[in-house]
């Protein structure tokens, strides 16, 4: 009886431990996976401001390149690739929220013309699915199917992100026309420097909030520092809190000025935005162009044959 109770207790403890671990994993993964897009989605109705600036730049302060490749023209009701490239040095490591170093993640927002949207799974070819990998795209808003977001995802695997896009058909959507359309993209690598509420992350420089002498630097138990600055003129003390993961540039007894950097800049990432143009091509116009080109080629052939025939007639008359 004693043995049975012991085994039962062990089984319950193991089950409880596994359950807790799974819950922690799910919560952590959910918070990480939704972190980047949800900041913009919660605070901005549209990710592109009237000035053309994409709102992700409000949190990711460093400027880095981003590129997008799309076909020059597409036919209605066809699926095409929009490839967003977010280049960076794969050897770089960033400061994570816990103060440790880790690999960079990437994220992107793609703003398509009205009517263009994410292609349904049954319209995506096997070749395109292989390029997409395990990426899961989402609409910026339920009613904004033309704005897509993705991230954060591992940068080492997805520095090139392939969006499968379905072109609209003017025959079924009267708001769409056969025209040249602009599209816009924003892409980031690494964590941001500022949260939407205006507070700093631990992925940026921390400056002195007062000038004076550093009287004390206290290293906190869970990481980070408390720097006490004494103003020599009035003996007023100011304590600056430095989060974990940052490298100090100052020491006790040092004289510093207002806004002087207390830490080095840990940020190795950044945000960039770009644009491209795509033509929604009328199939009848393409057919007309092909017919015209065929007519020109046939006319050239007939002209050459006629010239050959004329030369033969002239040659025969001369021989006669």
Swiss-Prot record:
Localization per Swiss-Prot or TrEMBL: Plastid, Chloroplast thylakoid membrane
Membrane disposition: Single-pass membrane protein
Chief localization: plastid
Example GO BP: photosynthesis
GO cellular component: chloroplast thylakoid membrane
Residues annotated to bind heme: 36, 56, 59-60
Purpose: Component of the cytochrome b6-f complex, which mediates electron transfer between photosystem II (PSII) and photosystem I (PSI), cyclic electron flow around PSI, and state transitions.
Protein name: Cytochrome f
Organism: Arabis hirsuta (Hairy rock-cress)
